[in-house]
Amino acid sequence: MGSLVLPLSAVFCLVAHSASGSPIMGLEQSPLEEDMPFFDDIFTEQDGIDFNTLLQSMKNEFLKTLNLSDIPVQDTGRVDPPEYMLELYNKFATDRTSMPSANIIRSFKNEDLFSQPVTFNGLRKYPLLFNVSIPHHEEVVMAELRLYTLVQRDRMMYDGVDRKITIFEVLESADGSEEERSMLVLVSTEIYGTNSEWETFDVTDATRRWQKSGPSTHQLEIHIESRQNQAEDTGRGQLEIDMSAQNKHDPLLVVFSDDQSNDKEQKEELNELITHEQDLDLDSDAFFSGPDEEALLQMRSNMIDDSSARIRRNAKGNYCKKTPLYIDFKEIGWDSWIIAPPGYEAYECRGVCNYPLAEHLTPTKHAIIQALVHLKNSQKASKACCVPTKLDPISILYLDKGVVTYKFKYEGMAVSECGCR
């Protein structure tokens, strides 16, 4: 049996209807439900399709879009995302006119939690370790190292602390010996610190190089030195990097990348919307020779002008339309790895597509013919289906193997418009 593909928004419609426990929606049963089979009724009518198998395949489709092979297994306990990642999510979730520089943003935390900074002749060194994994098909747009600088000074005597900060990449020797390691300068800048705050360093080139090498661990070393000689700098204050474990000011490597999948996904969504049409045989033996273009346009015109009681009756509530459907990630057991949002309004398309089809439902030529055939002989063709014709994306903040990841536009998650197909 060939694979069955449905719009991604249908994943959560199915999960919502099949989830155990309290219902996701508190809506009363609509009168139109008498005329509409539930999902499991629909699929059991089709030979060889198992509902549970279908549901699992659709969940897999959702995970595949996020480049996940399975629901990420998380450590026990809730993971607190970096403050910066929450700020990004809230910024773009509340202001839809804002656009991030990339569709995917990942944050990698410092993995070296035991090494301590070392000071020698006025030079202070901080070791950092990042386990970086970025899919090869993504384009790294930008990468930045975020360090929280702690400024300690006598506010009565000095305006600030003058320091030079250099970011080195520690390159391992061929034989792995520490004596033969070399240091590559990634970025160097001068900072006049007046208050404790975040400082950002561009490490895009290095991150692109790391991406090509595949998932691997990379060691950095931060050097902080005074711009004055040691005698002049004595007592002027200190500038340090906050390295406290489990601190909201942990060093953070933030990678902005583009999966270049928007166009591809939108085309796939369009194909998914009309997949069921390809299964309907409209040859001359099973049905009738379809009308030519002129006759079809006339048929459409007649439908628009028709003011019969049927149209008025259908317009009262049971015609195809967008209805509320709130998805709560906790209800379906995905709150362990989806950080934000806790849920979202996905909407769904409900109702019937009786002939004649209204213009606002933007029916295809095929749907018009199918509705007409069903009207003449319901045994030959089923009614046209009420389905999403336009889908909107949502933003999502989630955990992928311990890496807090933000995806600005996860396509096909919310119904924008419904129609008959």
From Swiss-Prot:
Which InterPro entries does the protein's record reference? Cystine-knot_cytokine (IPR029034), TGF-b_C (IPR001839), TGF-b_propeptide (IPR001111), TGF-beta-rel (IPR015615), TGFb_CS (IPR017948)
The UniProt entry, under SUPFAM superfamilies, shows: Cystine-knot cytokines
Subcellular localization, as worded in the UniProt entry: Secreted
Q: Which UniProt keywords apply?
A: Cell adhesion, Cleavage on pair of basic residues, Cytokine, Developmental protein, Disulfide bond, Glycoprotein, Growth factor, Secreted, Signal
**Per its UniProt record, what Pfam families does this chain match?**
TGF_beta, TGFb_propeptide
The intrachain disulfides are C320-C386, C349-C418, C353-C420
Highest taxon, organism lineage: Eukaryota
Q: Where does the UniProt entry place glycosylation sites?
A: N67, N131
Tissue-wise expression: In the embryo, expressed exclusively in the ventricular trabecular myocardium of the developing heart from 9.0 dpc-13.5 dpc. By 16.5 dpc-18.5 dpc, only detectable in atria. Highly expressed in the adult heart where it is found in the right atrium but not in the left atrium. Lower levels in adult liver and lung.
Q: Which Gene3D superfamilies match?
A: 2.60.120.970, Cystine-knot cytokines (2.10.90.10)
MF annotations from Gene Ontology? cytokine activity; growth factor activity; hormone activity; receptor serine/threonine kinase binding; telethonin binding
Q: Which residues cross the membrane?
A: none
Q: What CDD domains is this protein classified in?
A: TGF_beta_BMP10
Q: What is the consequence of disrupting this locus?
A: Mice die in utero between 9.5 dpc and 10.5 dpc. They appear normal at 8.5 dpc-8.75 dpc but display cardiac dysgenesis at 9.0 dpc-9.5 dpc with profound hypoplastic ventricular walls and absence of ventricular trabeculae and have a significantly lower heart rate than wild type embryos. Mutants show up-regulation of Cdkn1c/p57KIP throughout the ventricular wall while levels of Mef2c and Nkx2-5 are normal at 8.5 dpc-8.75 dpc but are down-regulated at 9.25 dpc-9.5 dpc.
Q: To which protein family does this belong?
A: Belongs to the TGF-beta family.
Q: How does it assemble?
A: Homodimer; disulfide-linked. Interacts with FBN1 (via N-terminal domain) and FBN2. Interacts with ENG.
Q: What is this protein called?
A: Bone morphogenetic protein 10
* Organism in which the protein naturally occurs: Mus musculus (Mouse)
Starting at the broadest rank, the lineage of the source organism is: Eukaryota, Metazoa, Chordata, Craniata, Vertebrata
